[in-house]
Amino acid sequence: LAVAGESAEFCTPGVHIGLFCSTPMVALSRNLGRKHAMEMLLTGDRIKASEAARMGLVNRIVSKGSALTEAMNIATLIATKSPATIAIGKRAFYEQAEMTLEDAYRYASNVMVENMLARDAEEGIGAFMEKRPPNWTK
């Protein structure tokens, strides 16, 4: 996840001096569509925070000086969720990305079964039905 201040700018300027930004390329190619990543890498042009958000490079834009606070707010919100479920989800997200579409759906179905059988799923559904906060496993 990424939070940027409204005045933030992003670029891969190496091409201006005869260097291709190959290490930033790895992150860009995994977080943006090919066309957006290639445009940034081949032009070296600066993009504003609003364009970065439109492209999917950042999740949120906040007022100057509040990016860290907003990032902590997001982290705090995530920390209220089941640690086991977050771990299952993160693992599945990254593992399926390397699979064929068919294999990814098969894998995701297995992950869903694994998740549904987990104690925290039972606790979360029970808490929802009983209108109380869940007590996640630690």
Model regions and ranges:
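Terminal low-complexity tails and localization/encapsulation signals of metabolic enzymes
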Residues: 126-138
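Terminal peptide-recognition signature
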Residues: 28, 52, 89, 128
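CoA-thioester-processing core
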Residues: 1-40, 55, 70
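C-terminal long alpha-helix characteristic of the crotonase
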Residues: 3-8, 58-106, 113, 119, ...
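Structural motif
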Residues: 55-56, 131
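Acidic, divalent-metal-coordinating active-site segment for phosphoryl/phosphodiester hydrolysis
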Residues: 44-51
